[in-house]
Amino acid sequence: MTNVWFATDVNLINCVLKDNLFLIDNNYIILNVFDQETDQVRPLCLGEINALQTDAAAQADAMLDTSSTSELQSNAST
């Protein structure tokens, strides 16, 4: 599935996110949104970051992208 981004889409996203997306206490992702019921802008928590993986941990726990031919299974009958 390929998404095609038009210049108007990119401009709209940039306008919404510019100076509007915040990280609080290195844990909470906050976005200011317009509440139509109260006719006011209010903060909305998009989520919480519970864990970060450092480069050292990523290298130690990384899975290999390739396998040797002896590890590959074959569906061919002999």
Curated annotation (Swiss-Prot):
Keyword list, A-Z: DNA replication, Host nucleus, Transcription, Transcription regulation, Viral DNA replication
Record carries keyword Acetylation: no
User: What processes in GO biological process is this protein linked to?
Assistant: DNA replication; viral DNA genome replication
Q: Does the keyword Cytoplasm apply?
A: no
UniProt subcellular location: Host nucleus
Q: Which GO terms describe its cellular component?
A: host cell nucleus
Described by its record, this protein's role is as follows:
Plays an essential role in viral DNA replication.
The text of the family note is:
Belongs to the baculoviridae LEF-10 family.
What is this protein's record name?
Answer: Late expression factor 10
List the top taxonomic levels of the source. Viruses, Viruses incertae sedis, Naldaviricetes, Lefavirales, Baculoviridae
